Amino acid sequence: PICMIDLDTIMPGTSLFDVGDALRSIANTASEDDKTTDNVSFSTEIFEKFVTGYIKGMCGKLTTAEIELIPESIWVIAMELGMRFLKDHIDGNKYFATEYDGQNLERARIQLKLADCVYEKISSGELHGIVHEIQRKVDAYEV
């Protein structure tokens, strides 16, 4: 018998890939298959709730770097996925299944706009401020 395994499933790495991907997906106000970037924004409310539960649930197992880099992990994953959608569009939609012409191009635009939204919130200090406040509350047993 032969078994195919996706290397993402077994490769060593940081939890930041999974956290970034989860937040990229759930905190984006647009769906991945939206037809316009007008609906794209990044919900800091969802971000705060997710990160609070994540840090609290990890019970001190995260390194300082893993906590500090949560905002950047979202940006990295959104950029990576945006580029992958764009490359697949250019290559003729061979990797990601599509239902209509141009769908992967639209998906790329959504992810790259999301990356831009996240970058703005990182640059302004908003996301890191939220993370620091959550960490302070967790350390003080306030959440």
Which residues make up each language-model segment?
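Active-site acidic catalytic loop and adjacent metal/ATP-binding pocket
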Residues: 1-17
